């Protein structure tokens, strides 16, 4: 049996960890932890420490650890059909069922869902679809994406550029061109402590308007935002923020991408953060709570308006050349189906609303 010391040595010698001080970890200076089991809201490491996982992994294990129903669904799918791709119209019962379940829970104006693996790749997909749509609609100059400082949207080339945290840009030559950032609705960090919430909301709206005027509305394709800031502070927007922002987007024909990776599937006491704040997004990013992290899966939900442009594009140009090998992976989809069933059966969305958790 492997000892803790042997595993720790292998870890230092072989494993390049995400978001880690790599040199300190390799030298054994940064404390690591080797996890073994999880049950409910607790996890246990190899040293026998039982820990309250108040962060739910990376705010993703919405149904808690150790749900056997999801484990059995994964095992059954792996035994029956461990993999098949989703290219050129192929599907599985799990992927088709999950698509239906997601759209049944999505806002009424949403039309289709595309499945990937994680929130980062979903936001890469979102931006590609926005660019594709504007090319189809004869607006090749309308390609810039406005994100927000302190926002988090992943760590890929596009998604890392969308992220508004310097750590994810440093030494990576990010953000890329076409990605712009505006004020975050973080009241505590307001530029003038004399501002009340109403004044700060007006400031955020004015900053967005000024950016649009400076760049040209005809060059800006979309605005991406988490309904409530996640990694940037887990901070709700001040009262009236979204009511001030959405009319600006509508006036300038700028699509709204709601990044629901964290806020989706009940985290705010409603199925979507967009529901909580009364938003009507054109595209929604989903991941984390889609499977409660029992298997990797993400999604891009597109509105009827976006879908019509995608449909037009393929009628005019043929197959749309976008996809991942593991798009709609059947094991991930099976986990998603079982997870959403549990979310309903256990009343977890209502419980979050009632307890304020």
Stretches with model-predicted labels:
Residues 1-357:
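Conserved N-terminal phosphate-binding loop of PLP-dependent enzymes in the Aspartate aminotransferase
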């Amino acid at each position: 049996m492997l000892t803790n010391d042997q595993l720790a040595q292998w870890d230092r010698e072989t494993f390049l960890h995400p978001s880690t001080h790599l040199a300190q970890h390799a030298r054994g200076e940064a404390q690591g932890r080797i996890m073994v089991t999880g049950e409910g809201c607790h996890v246990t490491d190899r040293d026998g420490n039982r820990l309250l996982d108040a962060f739910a992994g990376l705010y993703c294990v919405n149904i808690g650890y150790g749900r056997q129903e999801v484990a059995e669904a994964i095992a059954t799918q792996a035994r029956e059909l461990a993999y098949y791709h989703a290219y050129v119209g192929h599907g599985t019962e799990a992927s088709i069922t999950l698509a239906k379940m997601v759209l049944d829970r999505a806002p009424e104006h949403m039309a289709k869902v595309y499945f990937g693996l994680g929130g980062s790749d979903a936001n890469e997909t979102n931006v590609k679809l926005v660019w594709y749509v504007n090319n189809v609609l004869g607006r090749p100059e309308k390609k810039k994406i406005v994100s927000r400082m302190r926002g988090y949207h992943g760590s890929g080339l596009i998604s890392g550029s969308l992220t508004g945290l310097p750590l994810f840009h440093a030494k990576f030559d990010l953000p890329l061109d076409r990605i712009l950032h505006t004020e975050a609705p973080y009241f505590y960090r307001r530029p003038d402590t004399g501002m009340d919430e109403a004044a700060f909301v007006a400031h955020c709206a004015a900053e967005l308007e000024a950016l649009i005027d400076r760049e040209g509305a005809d060059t800006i394709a979309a605005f991406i935002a988490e309904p409530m800031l996640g990694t940037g502070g887990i901070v709700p927007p001040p009262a009236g923020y979204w009511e001030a922002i959405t009319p600006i987007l509508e006036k300038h024909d700028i699509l709204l991408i709601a990044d629901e990776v964290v806020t989706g599937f009940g985290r705010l006491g409603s199925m979507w953060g967009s529901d909580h704040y009364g938003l009507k997004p054109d595209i929604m990013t989903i991941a984390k709570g889609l499977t409660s992290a029992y298997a990797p899966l993400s999604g891009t939900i597109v509105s009827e308006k976006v879908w019509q442009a995608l449909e037009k594009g393929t009628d005019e140009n043929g197959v749309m050349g976008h996809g991942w090998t593991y798009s709609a992976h059947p094991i991930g989809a099976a986990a998603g189906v079982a997870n959403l069933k549990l979310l309903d059966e256990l009343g977890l969305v209502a419980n979050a609303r009632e307890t304020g958790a």
